[in-house]
Amino acid sequence: MMHKERIWDIKEYNSQMADYLAEELNISPMVTGILLERGLQDAASMRDFLYGSAAPFHDPFLLKDMQRSVERIERALAAGEQITVYGDYDVDGISASSLLYLYLKQRGGRVATYIPQRKSEGYGLNDEALKNIAEKGTTLVITVDCGISGLREVANAPKSLDIIITDHHTVPEVLPPAYAIINAKQRDCGYPFKDLSGVGIAFKLCQALEQREPGRLPEWQGLTELAALGTVADIVPLIGENRELVRRGLKAMETTKLVGLRALIKASGCPETGIASDNIGFGLAPRLNAVGRLEHAQLAVELLVTDDSVKAEKIAAELNRENALRQEISRQIMEEAEAQLAQEKHIDTAIVLASEGWHQGVIGIVASRLVDKYHLPTILISLNNGVAKGSCRSIPALNLYEAIDAERDLLTQYGGHHQAAGLTLPAELLPEFKRRFREYVAQKLRPEDYLPHQAIDCVLSGSSEISIRDLEQLALLEPCGCENQAPVFAFRQALLHNQRAMGKERNHLQFVLDKGYNSYRGLMWNNADLLPYMFENMVADVAFQPKINVWNNETSVQLQAVSIHQQVTLGDMRQAADDKWRLLLGLAKVHNKVLAYTEDKQSLPAEVLQTAGDYLELASYEEAAGMSKERLQQAEEIVLLDLPAYPLADIMRRLRQQGAKHVTLLFNQPDLQERLQRLALTHPDRDAMMQAYKLVMNALKMRTTVSIKELLSAHAEQISEQAVKIMEELGFIRYNNGIIEKAAIKRCSLEDAPLYVTLQQERERLEHIYKENYRLSQHELLRC
């Protein structure tokens, strides 16, 4: 399988309005243009978005069951009851557990945290844990980032426990019989913002508790960095309350009093000032996640809540080691998953792979990478002692929770979001689950849903220069993330050179981009596999996020490419195509759908067609002009099997305009020789006409007539019907109904035969096309 190139969705905005608003707000039109694209249409809404509003947070008591929850917690604090915060092992759950623990501690509460062990306990509430918690004296359990799917566990919990569920996951039809449930997604909950993370819900609980203590600085204001940590890591929309939480939290991180967070920032190599959402997503969150995936997330909670700097540094170093190990395990599983994919038959709806020994805590990361690469819903499953535990990731068009819910009769446990989920089922039911899941996906999605898209905020003109000043202005859009993506720009017809692989695994692409009078260094993460399709000084359209890069105390603009549209990626196998049928079958095996253009669809050997099966579709070059974009874009690979009788540059241009992405040339030197030999026969020159004349006259010496069929059968490589027709035009013979008769001989010139003149002109044209099609270099073809 080959990864799919993204379709660009180029946004547009009113440039005059952008200029007007930019002047009113005293910011760059580049920023106001992007905000116009994103639905903000006036200066007031833009000002609130960029700088924050005076009252950014909704009343927490608008959340259903908040009043009941606060009253129960207040009673527990007043009576000195033991409270346990029951969390989850991802960053959202870790930060939510830490935030609520620290807040309740500051309020004088007797509080503990409990994070289930991923491998042995799995996600969410479990009977044994609740039993043990109760036996240790806890009377109030507050869940964070989990619990909404724990119907059975809450029902079976010890009667001595009151359970308050705070969660943000999809709400099931039947709710657990908990003391209270705080989840903005409940059907009868009137809270106006539905996209809070788990830590966001915990934050709202702290807000509500603070409103009972007026007249003092709210304790939660000192914990916004934890709210930012989980909100960014859980990839919830960074709009509304989430945006304000993250904005405040990122600022608070620079001067945080949380010694564990300071140690983590230092260990991860993040800057101590100017911390951005990217630093959480790529620096802090992976380290917190790693310990939860490989060992026990309780260690991450200990880091975030400790006030011991020595202990914090020790745990941060341990998290670094766990993260390095997680990266290695991820690489190994990715390789094994790719190997399985290579053995699978036709995969066009969803990827479902399983293996003994795959680390349950890491398969979700690999599933995400497979989705990024192939743009197919993906489930990776770890098999252990007859139990199959899977991590699921989706594409935007598929609601993954609904897709898995449709197979709930096969599952022992499941839960999740629109785009990510987890599940458990008996291993023996895996084949049935795989079949039904793929059928569900096939019924729900259309062909166009499988095509990845890339939003482009602005296509820059050739004279545009991206400056440090521009990037400082774009920083006003931070924090960026889900539903407030970092802006993406594009250059058309940029020149790329000095391409090479970089990184420890040599899996990243580095290049230099020239546009107009400006030159930029660029990179593209995890895309070194594009190198075989690239060449020095190639022309391409490049979509990118501009970043400030500091190296050796020098500051420059660096382009982080997210999509490169080479005019068409071209595989040139003309010099290596001695066995074109073997190569064609190889391409059909690698790609889900190969469309092969050929001069004669009947010329392919039957065994090739049989072996390729549904992977291979044939089309004549004559069909190419009328082929729909939809049909063409369904093919992952276009193969030019025979030397075409049309200019190859025109074919490449048409394929590019129709949206073809990958083209392979399979015609070779023998094809060229065969075409020229056939031209010599079907478009005879003077020497060929003299030879044909002698053959006909010799045949007519023995009898008065001769059959054209008989003549061609005896001399197939020396004479053609066109030569006979030319002789008829010159009056040398009479030719009717396939029978040749001798006529009176008269002196004349070959040029007196219109057919001869036409054929010579056509021969000259076709010879030039054939030779030029074979001669044109890959570089020249891609510049067409």
Segments the model singles out, each with a brief description of its role:
Residues 131-199, 203-212, 222, 239:
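Active-site cavity-forming subdomains of large catalytic enzyme subunits
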Residues 105, 110, 243-338, 394-412, ...:
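Acidic, two-metal ion nucleic-acid-processing modules in DNA metabolism proteins
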Residues 99, 177-214, 220-232, 654, ...:
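Short alpha-helices
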Residues 152-156, 351, 366, 607-608, ...:
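A short acidic, amphipathic alpha-helical/loop segment
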Residues 2-3, 13-140, 159-160, 177, ...:
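Hydrophobic helix-and-loop "lid/oligomerization" segment in the mid-to-C-terminal part
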Residues 88-89, 116-119, 146-147, 168-171, ...:
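Short, ordered loop/turn segments at secondary-structure junctions
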Residues 629-675:
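Conserved RecA-like helicase motor core of SF1/SF2 enzymes
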